[in-house]
């Protein structure tokens, strides 16, 4: 959008910009069905008035807001040129990224269009891609480092994106197999106390990983890949004593590892392998007196070459928008009441705020 002089000079401190939508894009793709995308922009910038006439869009009002509106439409056009449609969620996230850059909350090195058009994996008619700046940086870190920690609240996509990168690496023959693991902490990994076969015992704890796999691969191919050992889904206890070469390894729910388990897992790394460790340090379900390996490892490995820590926040939640506000509300409550994981500090570390 470019600034255009008009006969109606804006008041002092205000500005006006005008934008022409290229002929190859219909106004519906830019404004949304029933002007749904336009309403998102208007709600985000109450200090400006936006007018549409034919294929011309103009904005008048607060100079800062008008400048941001111009950038929003510019970013939208860049996304549309790739053939990717704009959604209300994408517009909201574009606005949030631009405002964060304007307020100095981010360095602005990546634009919304760069974030929203970075495709990781296309499967079953849908494309998996990052939706926030922190998610993009997390995905980029996985490409650039051997060991990456994705730490953040439920719903930030840390496990899902890691699994998409694992499938991408397998399909491009960067690795020969995928290994997915998580601690079965709810049973204390004492699975012998549970009824049923071994598969029946461990399946409830590993089911979220299976669900993600079904989103990314042909469901009919998964049993074949697992039977061949190309994909392995197993409890953390089954990693002991192994060296994992030519593999993309993901440890999920890492906040529920002990320091000893975390060290054991990290030292399974073999040649030509990559490790991604995900977890939420506010959801620790370990028994009394047991430290979280995910908390401790940050103090030990932060700054080590080829190891990266990506931290996501409520702003990166990609579930229902209410989830982000719920995460913030719990964090404020814990801070105000001096609690941790839903219990008084120093108390039992179970009963956290559960969900992923």
Model-derived features: where do they sit?
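Short amphipathic alpha-helix segments
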Residues: 26-45
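A short linear hydrophobic-aromatic micro-motif
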Residues: 46-50, 309-310
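Conserved helicase motor core of SF1/SF2 NTP-dependent helicases
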Residues: 123-133, 141, 145-251, 255-356
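Short glycine-/aliphatic-rich beta-strand segments at the starts of folded cytosolic domains
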Residues: 9-29
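N-terminal acidic, proline/glycine-rich, low-complexity intrinsically disordered segments
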Residues: 1-8
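Interdomain "pre-motor" coupling segment immediately N-terminal to P-loop NTPase/helicase cores
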Residues: 50-115
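P-loop NTP-binding catalytic core
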Residues: 106-130, 135-136
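Flexible glycine-/small-residue-rich
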Residues: 21-23, 52-54, 61, 182, ...
């Amino acid at each position: 959008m470019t600034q255009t002089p008009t006969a109606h000079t804006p008041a002092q401190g205000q500005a006006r910009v005008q934008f022409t939508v290229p002929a190859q894009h219909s106004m519906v793709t830019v404004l949304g069905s029933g002007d749904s995308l336009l309403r998102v922009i208007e709600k985000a910038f109450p200090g400006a008035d936006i007018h549409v006439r034919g294929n011309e869009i103009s904005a008048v009002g607060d100079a800062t807001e008008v400048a941001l509106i111009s950038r929003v439409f510019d970013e939208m056009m860049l996304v549309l040129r790739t053939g990717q449609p704009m959604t209300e969620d994408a517009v909201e996230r574009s606005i949030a990224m631009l405002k964060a850059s304007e307020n100095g909350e981010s360095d602005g090195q990546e634009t919304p269009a760069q974030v929203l058009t970075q495709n990781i994996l296309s499967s079953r008619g849908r494309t998996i891609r990052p939706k926030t700046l922190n998610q993009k940086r997390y995905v980029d870190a996985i490409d650039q480092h051997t060991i990456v920690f994705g730490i953040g609240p439920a719903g930030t996509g840390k496990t899902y994106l890691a699994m998409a990168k694992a499938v991408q690496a397998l399909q491009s023959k960067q690795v020969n197999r995928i290994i997915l693991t998580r601690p079965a902490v709810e049973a204390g990994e004492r699975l012998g106390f549970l009824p049923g076969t071994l598969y029946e015992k461990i399946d409830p704890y590993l089911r979220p990983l299976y669900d993600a796999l079904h989103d990314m691969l042909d469901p009919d191919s998964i049993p074949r890949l697992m039977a061949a050992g190309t994909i392995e889904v197993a409890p953390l206890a089954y990693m002991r004593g192994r060296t994992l070469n030519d593999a993309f390894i993901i440890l999920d729910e890492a906040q529920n590892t002990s320091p000893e388990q975390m060290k054991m897992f990290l030292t399974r790394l073999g040649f030509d392998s990559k490790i991604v460790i995900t977890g939420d340090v506010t959801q620790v379900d370990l028994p009394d007196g047991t430290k979280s390996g995910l908390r401790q490892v940050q103090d030990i490995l932060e700054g080590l070459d080829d190891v990266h820590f990506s931290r996501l926040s409520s702003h990166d939640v990609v579930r229902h928008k209410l989830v982000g506000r719920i995460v913030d509300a719990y964090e404020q409550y814990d801070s105000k009441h001096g609690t941790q994981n839903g219990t008084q500090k120093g108390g039992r570390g179970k009963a956290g705020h559960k969900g992923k």
